[in-house]
């Protein structure tokens, strides 16, 4: 902290006054000061020089680098001067010099010298604090001492911050207080607050050194306002061209700007400017670690690895920042790495890691060397640690994912996760990254069985990469993309990619040609071109009769219009290749579509035979579970024995599904089967949990309908309605009546649960819509009538204050409609319930419910009439009360206006009386003054004699009291006398008014006395202020 407490504008020739000779002095030329200040100290001691001369000469030695001599002068001053103020300032100056020496020792990494200088600082700073602990200089030095003692310790920084806060509170414009506080805030990462303090310091003194603009630029840089940072540093360079520290920062700006626009034409220009400024700073200060750090990168890019190692050593030796030291070791390791010296490279990387444990690139270097040394286990641990500490490191994730994928026992799940994270980082990265197409294909292969859509995305990226790089695209990649698109339902896109694959297919690859022909036929089949697909299958079978998949697809197409030949062909395929599980699965599906015999189900028999030989065939297990569940649901229960038999069928179905899940834990069809059985047994929570997981795997409306039914049974009506509406919006017109019936049922359950009429109206609406979609369905007709009846009952049962006559009339309409529908359903051929029960329901509604509703309507009419009468009475009473209040307010207003008028007349009368009284008083005073003038003329001689007598008498009294005639009268006494004369004057306020006519004279006298007292108090206050100003002035003179 150069110039912290010393005078920075001292004269070059200092005149030391000689003791006892006021007009003579000794001139000392500061440009030719002796290297030994002992003689100068003797002169100052002999002449008893004031404190400022000791500090001036100490400063002159200090700026010439002779700090020990400066300290010698200040210590001699401590032995000579005895006043506390001088001792405090001299101790503070010595502490400031030791602080600067400690800072230099810290930069040179001389820990012992630094500690010694800091001990000296503490010694002299404590001496200064013992004299004046609240001195701004001492507090500032204590704050700087705390920073140098431990720049990274939070407690030390907090203590230093309290020191600077104290100084700023005591002296709000202290520049060093601003800079110290800003330095601490910057170290804490509070760059905005630090910026404000640096700016306040700059406003206070734009010419201050060190320049606050440097700190302003650093704050702007960390706030990502790099253009503003450049402006601040450029201004520093304009004001002080010799300041090469700023060249480093300006070079850093252009270096960063260049690498933000690597593919831009401005890269070369910005990089050249960066090197120009960095080289200028390096030439002036070749030990600058920041400049060396940037230059080592440039030298490395030129493949001058020896030069890079030398610059890295320079950074390590001259830097006190752990991050810069780690950076130096890292570039040294990279140079050795490129030179093939893996041992030295590993040692350098490890030293970089030891210097800064958060240095990411050194950890990557260690992992790379471990891979080169074939220590894959250690490499895996290293890159796992990197991925945990820095989740945005793309390279670490890629390497770690490849290591897991290429392991002897590959962890595909972890490999997928790591590579997926790496690819997600590519899009968000500001730096351009190149990803090889093989890496995309590898990731697609890892995700193929888990997420088809994601796998297709990676294959598409690989295709885009090859096309953008103008590289050839193989038919295998196009075929794989088409297969995934087919599974995702993107049939037109898959068809187009297969055509492209056939166009680039080499002639000498018949196996791939057969595969593409079959895939193209499958696409034609899905597009509805069954004739084209059938012809394609026939063509394939002509060339390759043993291609079983083509034969199966051909039979499936023929089943749309089956004949005896088709059945024979299916059985022939089964007999010819009964060991093929695909054939057996197809034959089992074929049996499930046939009419089942009551004694034995051929589907169950076929699946059981398959599982005897292939117990892990998942398709057969799921198909067997479906067969058992279908049998249980179709089984009619009339007694407990039959109920137990149906329960056994459900248990068999669950066992089949459970076996399928054991072999394939992610089999969604088996899971859905278990969920359906749980729902049949009213275990809706468990069923919902399973169906929620199955939903993403099976893209089928039936899964959503099952979820909605479970939610409705669990009374989660809002969610159930949302699910059914989603299904309704995505279902074809011919199939919507079932979903509409589900919606009507949910709204009915919700309305009955919450007793809400609007919910039942929604139920009626959806039930009616379902009936409109399928008017011939008697179940839907019954649903409408039932909901209408429930709506009528709910409205009727509501209390009188919660319903209206209109609501009851609407309920009557719904009841009539339901009665009509029930009567109609009795004569339907296949009613949903027995005609007797439906007829009984219609009679009850017609005879009982309708009469109750009619009585309710009559009671509601009477209730509403009574309520209306009460409301009318209340309204009349409110209007009367309002009229009464208005009349009272009007009377009060008139009374107030009359009172104000009377007061105004009285006020005007009193003002006229005061004016007349003033005139009479003025006339009386003029008469008195004329009379007194005559009397004074006559008695002038007499008064003069009396004054002489009083003067002689006052002299006698003053001599008795010890006061001489030459003593001055204090200014305060003189003013007090003036005040006494002013007191005798009578002043009447112009604002004075009489309260009562009868007490006018007495009030006048009280007002005059009060005015005089206030005036006297004001004069005394003014007198005190004057005395205060005089005392301050006298103190400045003394100083």
Swiss-Prot record:
PTM annotation (Phosphoserine): residues: 930, 932, 959, 961, 964, 998
PROSITE patterns: TPR, TPR_REGION
GO biological process entries: potassium ion transport; regulation of DNA-templated transcription; transcription elongation by RNA polymerase I; transcription elongation by RNA polymerase II
Coiled coil: 838-929
One GO term describing the cellular component: Cdc73/Paf1 complex
Composition bias, Basic and acidic residues: 1007-1018
Protein name as annotated: Tetratricopeptide repeat protein 1
Organism from which the protein derives: Schizosaccharomyces pombe (strain 972 / ATCC 24843) (Fission yeast)
Upper taxonomic lineage: Eukaryota, Fungi, Dikarya, Ascomycota, Taphrinomycotina
Gene this chain is encoded by: tpr1
């Amino acid at each position: 902290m150069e110039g912290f407490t010393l005078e920075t504008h001292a004269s070059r020739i200092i005149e030391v006054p000689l003791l006892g000779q006021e007009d003579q002095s000794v001139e000392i030329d500061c440009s030719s000061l002796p290297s030994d200040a002992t003689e100068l100290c003797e002169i100052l001691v002999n002449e008893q020089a004031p404190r400022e001369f000791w500090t001036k000469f100490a400063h002159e030695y200090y700026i010439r680098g002779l700090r020990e001599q400066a300290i010698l002068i200040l210590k001699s001053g401590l032995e000579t001067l005895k006043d506390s103020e001088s001792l405090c300032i001299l101790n503070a100056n010595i502490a400031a010099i030791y602080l600067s020496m400690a800072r230099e020792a810290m930069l040179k990494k001389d820990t012992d010298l630094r500690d010694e200088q800091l001990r000296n600082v503490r010694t002299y700073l404590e001496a200064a604090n013992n004299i004046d602990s609240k001195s701004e200089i001492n507090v500032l030095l204590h704050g700087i001492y705390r920073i140098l003692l431990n720049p990274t310790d939070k407690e030390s920084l907090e203590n230093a911050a309290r020191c600077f806060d104290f100084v700023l509170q005591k002296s709000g414009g202290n520049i060093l207080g601003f800079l110290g506080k800003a330095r601490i805030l910057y170290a804490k990462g509070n760059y905005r607050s630090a910026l404000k303090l640096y700016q306040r310091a700059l406003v206070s003194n734009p010419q201050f050194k060190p320049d606050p603009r440097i700190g302003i630029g650093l704050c702007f840089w960390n706030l990502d306002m790099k253009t503003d940072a450049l402006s601040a540093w450029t201004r520093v360079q304009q004001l002080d061209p010799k300041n090469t520290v700023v060249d480093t920062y300006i070079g850093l700006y252009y270096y960063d700007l260049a690498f933000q626009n690597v593919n831009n034409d401005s890269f070369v220009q910005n990089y050249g400017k960066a090197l120009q400024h960095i080289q200028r700073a390096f030439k002036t200060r070749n030990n600058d670690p920041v400049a060396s750090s940037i230059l080592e990168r440039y030298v490395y890019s030129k493949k001058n690895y020896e030069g890079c190692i030398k610059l890295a050593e320079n950074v390590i030796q001259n830097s006190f920042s752990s991050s810069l030291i780690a950076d130096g070791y890292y570039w040294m390791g990279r140079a050795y790495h490129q030179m093939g010296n893996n041992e030295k490279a590993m040692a350098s990387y490890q030293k970089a890691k030891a210097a800064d444990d958060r240095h990411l690139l050194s950890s990557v270097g260690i992992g790379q060397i471990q891979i080169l040394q074939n220590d894959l286990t250690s490499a895996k641990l290293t890159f796992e640690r990197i991925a945990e500490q820095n989740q945005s490191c793309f390279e670490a994730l890629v390497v770690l994912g490849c290591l897991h994928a290429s392991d002897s026992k590959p962890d595909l799940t972890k490999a997928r996760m790591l590579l997926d994270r790496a690819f997600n980082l590519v899009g968000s990265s500001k730096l351009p990254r190149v990803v090889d197409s093989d890496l995309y294909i590898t990731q697609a292969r890892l995700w193929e069985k888990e997420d088809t859509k994601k796998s297709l995305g990676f294959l598409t990226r690989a295709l885009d990469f090859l096309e953008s790089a103008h590289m050839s695209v193989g038919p295998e990649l196009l075929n794989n993309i088409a297969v995934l698109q087919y599974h995702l339902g993107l049939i037109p896109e898959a068809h187009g990619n297969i055509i492209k694959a056939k166009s680039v297919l080499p002639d000498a690859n018949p196996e791939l040609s057969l595969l593409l022909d079959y895939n193209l036929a499958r696409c034609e089949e899905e597009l509805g071109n069954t004739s084209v697909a059938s012809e394609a299958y026939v063509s394939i079978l002509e060339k390759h009769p043993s291609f079983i998949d083509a034969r199966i697809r051909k039979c499936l197409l023929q089943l749309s219009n089956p004949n005896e030949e088709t059945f024979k062909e299916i059985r022939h395929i089964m007999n010819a290749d009964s060991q093929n599980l695909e054939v057996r699965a197809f034959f089992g599906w074929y049996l499930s579509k046939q009419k089942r015999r009551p004694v034995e189900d051929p589907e169950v028999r076929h699946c059981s035979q398959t599982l005897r030989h292939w117990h892990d065939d998942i398709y057969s297990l799921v198909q067997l579970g479906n067969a058992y569940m279908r049998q249980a649901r179709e089984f009619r229960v009339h007694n407990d024995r039959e109920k137990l038999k149906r329960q056994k069928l459900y248990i068999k179905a669950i066992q089949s599904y459970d076996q399928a899940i054991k072999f394939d834990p992610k089999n969604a069809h088996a899971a859905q089967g278990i969920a359906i059985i749980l729902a049949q047994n009213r275990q809706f929570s468990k069923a919902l949990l399973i169906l929620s997981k199955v939903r993403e795997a099976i893209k089928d409306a039936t899964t959503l309908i099952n979820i909605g039914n479970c939610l409705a049974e669990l009374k989660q009506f809002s969610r159930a309605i949302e699910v059914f509406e989603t299904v309704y919006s995505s279902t074809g017109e011919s199939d919507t009546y079932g979903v509409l019936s589900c919606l009507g049922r949910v709204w009915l359950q919700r309305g009955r649960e919450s007793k809400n009429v609007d919910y039942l109206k929604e139920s009626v609406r959806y039930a009616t819509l379902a009936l409109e979609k399928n008017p011939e369905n008697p179940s839907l007709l019954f649903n409408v009538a039932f909901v209408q009846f429930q709506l009528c009952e709910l409205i009727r049962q509501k209390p009188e204050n919660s319903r209206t006559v209109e609501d009851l009339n609407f309920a009557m309409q719904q009841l009539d409609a339901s009665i009509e529908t029930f009567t109609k359903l009795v004569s339907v051929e296949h009613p949903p319930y027995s005609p007797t029960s439906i007829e009984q329901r219609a009679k009850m509604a017609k005879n009982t419910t309708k009469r109750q509703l009619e009585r309710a309507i009559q009671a509601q009419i009477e209730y509403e009439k009574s309520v209306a009468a009460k409301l009318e009475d209340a309204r009349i009473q409110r209007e009367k009360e309002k009229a009464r209040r208005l009349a009272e307010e009007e009377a009060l207003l008139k009374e107030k206006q009359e009172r104000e008028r009377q007061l105004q007349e009285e006020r005007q009368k009193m003002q006229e009386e005061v004016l007349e009284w003033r005139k009479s008083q003025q006339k009386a005073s003029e008469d008195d003054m004329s009379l007194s003038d005559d009397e004074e003329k006559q008695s002038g001689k007499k008064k003069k004699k009396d004054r002489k007598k009083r003067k002689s008498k006052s002299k006698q009294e003053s001599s008795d009291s010890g006061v001489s005639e030459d003593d001055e009268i204090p200014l305060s006494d003189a003013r007090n006398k003036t005040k006494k004369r002013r007191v005798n004057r009578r002043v009447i306020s112009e604002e004075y008014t009489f309260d009562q006519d009868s007490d006018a004279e007495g009030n006048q006298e009280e007002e005059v006395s009060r005015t005089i007292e206030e005036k006297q108090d004001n004069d005394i206050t003014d007198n005190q202020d004057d005395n205060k100003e005089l005392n301050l002035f006298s103190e400045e003179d003394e100083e």
